[in-house]
Swiss-Prot record:
InterPro entries, A to Z: ATP-cone_dom, NrdR-like_N, RNR_NrdR-like
Gene: nrdR
Protein name: Transcriptional repressor NrdR
Record organism: Acidothermus cellulolyticus (strain ATCC 43068 / DSM 8971 / 11B)
Lineage of producing organism: Bacteria, Bacillati, Actinomycetota, Actinomycetes, Acidothermales
Any one GO MF annotation of this record: ATP binding
Similarity section: Belongs to the NrdR family.
Keywords tagged on the record: ATP-binding, DNA-binding, Metal-binding, Nucleotide-binding, Repressor, Transcription, Transcription regulation, Zinc, Zinc-finger
Function: Negatively regulates transcription of bacterial ribonucleotide reductase nrd genes and operons by binding to NrdR-boxes.
Cofactor: Zn(2+)
Pfam families in alphabetical order: ATP-cone, Zn_ribbon_NrdR
Gene Ontology biological process terms, A to Z: negative regulation of DNA-templated transcription
Chain intervals annotated as zinc finger (unnamed): 3-34
Cofactor note: Binds 1 zinc ion.
Domain of life: Bacteria
Length: 170
């Protein structure tokens, strides 16, 4: 790493820390030539390949803006939107790929958004999946109801004690 003061081609790492949100590493460095200290912030690049083929850096702000439109008029806080965007970025980075498609970004948004707000999920899914008719909405609502019923039944089953096989239960 070049020293920004004397342009010496080497530096020594004095301290390394992960930033608060965990997306970058902050390093304190020292130049062996001039002795001055400086800080660098290192992040792994995450790029999004859009449908048009254009590649641009991943932007949490864009995720938040898109989800905010779906949440308009809904009781969803800015903190919840920021947390959702963080979860989306974490999921995309966990793939280990430096480039993801806009389709993958949309898919990564759907899960956390469904947990956050059903109506916002339906709004986002309608744009993301290109709903063209009432039947598309009805099919998605039916799917959500079926999944919700399945989740409830699994919760009830886990909550009930398993009957013992005693002498009288044969």
């Amino acid at each position: 790493m070049y020293c920004p003061f004397c342009r010496h081609p080497d530096s020594r790492v004095v301290d390394s820390r992960v930033t608060d949100d965990g997306t970058a590493i902050r390093r304190r460095r020292s130049c062996p030539e001039c002795g001055r200290r400086f800080t660098t912030v290192e992040t792994a690049a995450l790029s999004v390949i859009k449908r048009s083929g254009v590649i641009e850096p991943f932007s949490r702000a864009k995720v938040i803006a898109g989800v905010r439109k779906a949440c308009q008029g809904r009781p969803v806080s800015e903190d919840a939107l920021a947390l959702l965007a963080q979860r989306v970025e974490d999921e995309l980075r966990a793939t280990g790929c430096s480039e993801v498609t806009s389709q993958e970004v949309g898919l990564a948004v759907l899960g956390p958004l469904r947990e956050l707000d059903d109506v916002a999920y339906l709004r986002f899914a309608s744009v993301y999946r290109g709903f063209e008719s009432l039947e598309d909405f009805e099919a998605e609502i039916a799917l959500q109801r079926a999944e919700r019923a399945l989740e409830r039944s699994e919760t009830v089953e886990r909550g009930r004690p398993v009957p013992s096989r005693g002498v009288d239960d044969r």
